[in-house]
């Protein structure tokens, strides 16, 4: 049978996620994968635009943040987001091609909730989103 087009997952369905990545191919692939779980996706092409979109778009419940981007990288963007009171507990998952332990530690040190290295395993990413969104629901 054809793989489920719309995967029903009550933790993910209808949730709004912000993708911040400068590579349109990554944005397209992530958007396609997350929309299959009935998630709502908005995106920005660098950290500065991501922060602007986060401020201007109500209801964003998680951020997927690339690290290496022009204008404002993911480290700077996560630091700025964590400096805003209303986003201190917003789940931010860092997405990076750098896979060394120090890279993970650097991401967590500036405010990432979690970290996943590229190339992304979509099942692992969905699992992380499920965990962080569930935790967010439980803390309300």
Residue ranges, per PLM feature:
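Receiver (REC) domain active-site loop signature in two-component systems and cognate sites
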Residues: 69-72
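Helix N-cap/capping motif at the beta->alpha junctions
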Residues: 22, 43-52, 74
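Charged docking surfaces used in two-component/phosphorelay signaling
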Residues: 28-36
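Disordered, acidic interdomain junction associated with two-component signaling
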Residues: 1-16, 51, 55, 131-140
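Active-site residues of response regulator receiver
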Residues: 66, 96
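Active-site beta3 strand of CheY-like receiver
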Residues: 58-65
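C-terminal output helix
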Residues: 120-129, 137
């Amino acid at each position: 049978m054809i793989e489920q087009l719309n995967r029903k997952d009550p933790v993910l369905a209808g949730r709004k996620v912000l993708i911040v990545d400068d590579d349109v191919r990554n944005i397209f692939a992530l958007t396609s994968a997350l929309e299959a779980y009935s998630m709502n996706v908005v995106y920005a092409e660098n950290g500065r635009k991501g922060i602007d979109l986060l401020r201007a778009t109500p209801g964003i419940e998680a951020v997927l943040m690339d690290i290496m981007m022009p204008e404002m990288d993911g480290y700077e963007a996560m630091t700025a987001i964590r400096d805003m009171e209303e986003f201190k507990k917003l789940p931010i998952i860092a997405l990076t091609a750098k896979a060394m332990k120090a890279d993970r530690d650097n991401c967590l040190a500036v405010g990432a909730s979690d970290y996943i290295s590229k190339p992304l395993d979509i099942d692992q990413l969905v699992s992380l989103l499920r965990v962080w969104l569930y935790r967010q629901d439980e803390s309300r």
